[in-house]
Regions:
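Charged, helix-rich terminal subdomains or tails
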Residues: 1-187
Length: 187
């Protein structure tokens, strides 16, 4: 998002400070609105699937929705789900978001996500740190593409990195991945 803000600044270099602040506010408000729209779309999609999830044996409480919003401010999003739907919820959110276009710079959104699948009693702050590491890893993955891999939308796409944590608290993602490395070097 930083590159887009920088482009907006360059495009509006001739504006007075107060006018530029208004344009930046419109841009920020559009981002906030679009991310909330995508999140609502994800919730609606999950809600449609709840009866099917219950039929497949997912033990969902009748009055407890399986997604909880923790942070939804601008382009910062953090939510908690029932573990078995975490990846799908992230995929749906990113799909809904990438279909939207910002009304100020007229560009589509790209996003990366880190999905940490942990036990219910796993320390939340460690799960959050893990999801941040995973998201950073997904961003590095996208950054590794050459510019010739940029899509028609002018982006390199979206990415999700995920990890199922089995209870050991390890501070480094590469150490975690090394621990679960297969004989052929994959993880």
């Amino acid at each position: 998002m930083g590159k887009r803000v920088e482009e907006l600044r360059k495009q509006n270099a001739g504006l007075k400070w107060d006018e530029y602040k208004k344009e930046l506010k419109r841009f920020s408000d559009a981002i906030d609105s679009d991310f909330k729209t995508a999140f609502r779309g994800m919730l609606d999609a999950i809600e449609e699937q709840v009866p099917h999830l219950i039929d497949k044996g997912l033990n969902l409480k009748k009055r407890a929705f399986p997604v909880r919003k923790l942070i939804l401010a601008g382009d910062d999003v953090c939510f908690v789900t029932e573990g078995r739907i975490g990846l799908e919820a992230a995929r749906i959110f990113i799909e809904k978001l990438s279909a939207l276009e910002n009304t100020v710079d007229h560009k589509k959104y790209t996003a990366c996500a880190g999905v940490a699948i942990v036990h219910q009693k796993y320390p939340f702050y460690k799960a959050y740190e893990l999801s941040e590491m995973l998201c950073s890893n997904a961003k590095r993955f996208l950054a590794s593409f050459n510019d010739d891999k940029i899509s028609e939308a002018g982006t390199k796409g979206c990415a999700i990195d995920w990890h199922i944590e089995f209870g050991e608290i390890i501070d480094d993602l590469s150490d975690m991945r090394r621990k679960y490395e297969t004989a052929d070097g994959g993880t």
